[in-house]
From Swiss-Prot:
Belongs to the BPG-independent phosphoglycerate mutase family. PANTHER family: 2,3-BISPHOSPHOGLYCERATE-INDEPENDENT PHOSPHOGLYCERATE MUTASE. Its EC number is 5.4.2.12. It comes from Mycoplasma mycoides subsp. mycoides SC (strain CCUG 32753 / NCTC 10114 / PG1). Its cofactor is Mn(2+). This is 2,3-bisphosphoglycerate-independent phosphoglycerate mutase. It catalyses: (2R)-2-phosphoglycerate = (2R)-3-phosphoglycerate.
Amino acid sequence: MKVKRPVLLAILDGWGISEPDKGNAVDNANMVFVEYLKKTYPWLKAHASGKWVGLPENQMGNSEVGHIHLGAGRINLESLAKLNHETKTNNIAKNDEIVKTFEYVKKNNSALHLMGLFSNGGVHSHFDHMIAIYKAAIDYGITNIKFDLITDGRDTKPKLAYDFIKDLLELIKQNNNIGIISSISGRYYAMDRDKRFDRSRIAYNAIVNRNNVRSFTNILDYIQQEYMINHDDEMIIPAFNQDDLNGNLKANDAIIMTNFRPDRAIQISSILTNKNYIAWQNEAFSDAEFIGDKIRFVSMMKYSDSVTSPHIAYPPKPLTNTLGQYLSQLGLKQLRIAETEKIAHVTFFFDGGNDYFKNGLAKNDEITLANAYIDLIPSAKVATYDLKPQMSAVEITDKLLEEIKKDEFDFIVLNFANCDMVGHTGNNKATEIACKTLDEQLKRIHEEFVLRHNGIMVITADHGNAEIMIDKDGQVNKKHTTSLVPIIITDLNIKLKQNDPEIAKVAPTILDLMNIEIPKEMELESMIDHN
């Protein structure tokens, strides 16, 4: 089977719509070609947050749920909503894996480590879930509880960890001082996802061996000291508590990792559990330090096959007949292309939690989705992406144009990470450069794919970010938004419906463009108006 006109889904990660403002990097970047597209082709504004992507009302969207819904064609109740319900009903305290972990700790007279992003951002975690498990552990009679906290500052305002942890200390006091903050780490270190093992190494030391790492005697003073040297929550240097000198992770201890989103939990969790993981073949780690086979590790959700612990509190229920899977079954040839930072998003997440591409790391002969191929472009090795706001967008486009010229693919999924990843640095000017870079790359792609190869581009985003770099209080905004996002379709022969569009309608719309029947699993309709 071969489609009449190939379709390219271009996902501009973090590209939202907002009113003109000095903090609107999208608007201020003067994206001339995007404006040309809007004047030339049908386009609309679509929902990408809250209930429209399976999240609680008014919850900002994120890359994971955005990509899931772009490929799903239906609303999928997301992890945050599920765990909020489990917490509210106290079912989390009855979860089989969590209860077995409590039993394990009591039997071994060992420590329970609660580890995760301690934040109310709701993108990777929510501290309500960790606190619920903490209270459940106390009710179960556990008294040796260690908090290994990861601080946010990216999906929240930059400096909220002080207040969050102050409240946690008060909660510990209210519970007869059961529990201690054993270590702290900014997410820059503990939640790296791009194999920067030098960062993971420091976080690992704070949790596991206490070697060559900072320490503190007063956690609040330590955070204040970090703030004074312009380290916001994301950048807090890992440290351990001197009052818990022997509280490092040991044999027979248990960890419950409370992050529910996989991508930034995979690397540190794999290091903690899997001796065959690439980090242990890397000079950053030595075999003698590995204790993963002597602990019980529980993740809230499935992270990756590289996390070898079998203990998952809420096992996945992958979606079926997502766009990629459906096209594969029809014998259509497809390509996924992104840089390292976002490769899991155009594979694992876009495929509804099905790991056909090994989280984007499979070689083409290892992919378990028929007729599917991948191009992985390395991300720049810089400390923060405002140092290179172009990221790897030019290299992605160069490779993509090579692939387009082959005239082989019926469907291509492309992710440009710039608006999101540079937006997260809080650097407004750099984010404007990031947006302008994408404008230039879209022009190159349009010339080759649409004008020379008669393809159709569907240009959209997974969530907003770069359009609000300064919040209403005048503070730097690094987090995602609840903004609407554009959907532009480069087909002059169609009209689009304007009735509350949402990004989950992108998949059925692409099938409609291909003149392919929409499967029953896709509960939403196409946005194309055939009247």
